[in-house]
Each structure stands twice: as structure tokens, then as C-alpha cells.
Amino acid sequence: MNDIRRTILWVIFGFSMVLLWDQWQVHNGNKATFFPTPAQQAKLATDAASAVPQPVGVPAAVVPSNPATVPVVEARSANKEWVEVETDVLKLSFDTEGGTLSRVEFLNHVDEHKPGSNVVLLDDSKDRIYTAQTGLISSVPGVLLPTHKTAMAVRPGVRKLKEGANELSITFESATQNGVKLVKTYTVKRGAYDMAVKHDIVNTSTQDITPQLYFQLVRDGNKLAGESSFYSTFTGPAVYTDAKKYQKVEFADIKKKKFDIEKQSSTGYIAMVQHYFASAWILPDGMNRNISMDAVDIGSNMADCCYRATLIAPLET
């Protein structure tokens, strides 16, 4: 019988509001409110996932300068299953394909351009593509591991935060692929706009494996409908590192490959900014990661689709 080995990694996926205020605070020499410095990030991760075990088996090795290619994003098929989770402030929709977070609705924030409707940030529809994806990359050429395109089973559980409860979780589990199974668990707390995301990589083979875990934010390059013609807020990816601090990148510059970001770091985050809101993947402080941004063709009929910001981190199990 094979010895089953596991690597468990917790990360934070969060949303922020009033991004312009945040940037104004930094510009004036104050601490960022929504996009903290690395020291603040560590506290955010601790607060959002209190009593959560620290990452296990994550090596200190430098991320390869030429990491394996992240699987290409593809348009969502019509036969995918949606799973909804609701807290007091968020309505979340997940796709069983990859356990992807595909829609986020803010229940306490009305959309100024759509009276009677709430703000929707992440979305996977005919009008918008904006999703948060994760998956594994094998270190062995030609060997496929579970990715954001892998069908996953959702475990039974509570789907709406109950009165008196402080948190709820939803778990997606892939089938074993080349001796490796990926189990994702999203945990969100009452009143919170961030969540702890646990990646449990189960190695059932007799071989040691050194996969890479990728985190990406994918969005089309279109502005929000109804945005004022007199002013325009930034929409696009952003990155924070110690070396180059906060950098935002225009979609047009990504398409032209005319941008300069820090490509390797042991701190920081990637984000996708949309109007006054943003989402971000925040990895544990001190964990090496490779950072990239690119334009990808997902086979969608939508104009200017799509772009992705990606973090890739090494693992060992």
C-alpha cells in the first residue's frame, strides 16, 4: 500500500473597497488600508485564518526563473455546475470545474449603475469574465496534475451561514490524477470580505513530487458599463512587491508586452482592480513566488478577452 503524503498550504483571497482612498493614503505617507505592507499582510493572514495551521512542506528554494506554463484559460462550458454559498455580506458562486470562484456579489452594496441590484465583482457570464483560479503544475513534462480545468466533486455541507454561526466552509475534491489529488477548501467568516483558501495536495504515489501551485485572476479587458465619460477609474491587474512596491498595469500594455513588474518575490500579492473594488491573492509572507501577467485567448466571443495575473509557488510532497 502506498504511503500517502500531504502538503497543506493556506492562502488568503480577499476583496477590498474604496481602492482610490487606499492609494491616496499611501501617496500621503500613511499606511495602506486595503492593500497592506508585507508586515500588515502577515497580520491579515493571521486574522483571517486564526488557528489555521501554517503551511507544511513548502520549501525555501527559489522559484524557477522559467516556471512551467500555467494551463490556458478556456471559456466556460454551459454544462458546468454552480454551487452557491452565502454569508451575511457575500453571495459566492463556485464552479465545479476546478473549484473556481466565479461570481461574488456584495449583499450590502448597491450598484450605482444598476438600481435595485447589488455590486457584482467576480462574474462569469456573457457580459463579463472575471474569475479566481488555482491549480497544480507538474515538474515532469507531459505529466498532468489537477488544474482549474479539472472536474471536482463538492462535499456536502452548509451553504448559507446560519444564525449564531461565525464561519462556513466549502470543499472541492479532484479525482486522483497521476498519483496526485487536489482538495480545495474555502472558509469565510461572518462579516468578512476575505477568505482562507486551503490547498491539500495528496500524493498517493511512491514517488516524491515537486509540483508548483498557481493562483491567477482572469478578466476581460473591458470597462464597466455605465462608467462616466468625464472621468475613468483604473481597471486592470496590479502587483505589490518589496522591490517595486505597488504597480498597476494597463491591459493595453499587457497586450503589447510593454510593462515592467517584479517577476520574483517572497512577499506581496497580485490583484485585479475594477472601478472602486479589487480582489487579491495573498500568499504567506516569506514564501517564494513567481509573478506574471499575460493576454490569453480563451475562445470567447467577447471583445478584448482575456488577461490574467498569476502567482506560481513551489511545493514539495
Language-model segments: residues:
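Soluble non-transmembrane domains of integral membrane proteins
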Residues: S77, W82-T317
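Residue-level micro-sites within transmembrane alpha helices that shape
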Residues: R5, W21-D22
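Juxtamembrane extramembrane loops of integral membrane proteins
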Residues: W10, Q23-L121, F172
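Membrane interfacial helix-start segments of signal peptides and signal-anchor transmembrane helices
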Residues: M1-V11
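Hydrophobic membrane-insertion alpha-helices, especially the h-region
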Residues: L9-L20
